[in-house]
């Protein structure tokens, strides 16, 4: 009897050890083997300053950055919060998908409008008399077209900026309504907000609807790109950042370098012709 009990206990012990080993190996096989699969990609919620930079880069034409460009963009975004190369890659991938979907929607809307033109023309002709059509051009505004108080210079736009880049509400109409492929919670309101107080700086915005004014470049100015939009800035001397954009704003070069200013809020170095800069807020 003792030998039988001992044998039964040994069999049960071995079975328990085998079950324990199987339980320990189950997570490894579930994740793709003993080597361990890649961790699940977590949802990244970029900050407003990071979205502003990403949208500016995308609107400037860089819609599919290479690996080295992705790393450079990631280093620029890290100034405002934690981010990985994978986050940047998937942001651009998702952004391209939304742009293509938006383009298809616009194409369908234009096609429907073209089909309605013949009937509209026939209705106008039936009304009698020569029809008169007046197109009122609504000038687009740019959130970064600002007038400085006191001795601050004036920064003016030299191109008819796209509605996406010129609107203070970046891509509010292109953000998905919570779909599965919308990886990021895109903010619907972007841009720096003017602060009120002792040193008020008004953020004004305007754009001349006259086409001749769009091609005019004042003497003594250079053209730079701020947030993907071309602007004329004074070529001589440094730009008064505090007087033009407010003390809460700073300029970041496309290389990731923050442009230094003195105690009066004036750039120590002048802006360079044709260079790309990003206007962001110091407060995160």
Curated annotation (Swiss-Prot):
Transcription as UniProt keyword: yes
Keywords carried by this UniProt record: Developmental protein, DNA-binding, Homeobox, Nucleus, Transcription, Transcription regulation
Entry's Gene Ontology BP terms: adventitious root development
Primary localization class, coarse: nucleus
Organism superkingdom: Eukaryota
GO molecular function terms attached to this record: DNA binding; DNA-binding transcription factor activity
Record region (Disordered): 1-43
Localization, UniProt: Nucleus
DNA-binding residues (ranges): 39-103
One GO location term (cellular component): nucleus
InterPro entries: HD, Homeodomain-like_sf, WOX11-like
Pfam families: Homeodomain
Similarity-based family: Belongs to the WUS homeobox family.
Main function: Transcription factor which may be involved in developmental processes.
Protein name stated in the entry: WUSCHEL-related homeobox 10
Organism: Oryza sativa subsp. indica (Rice)
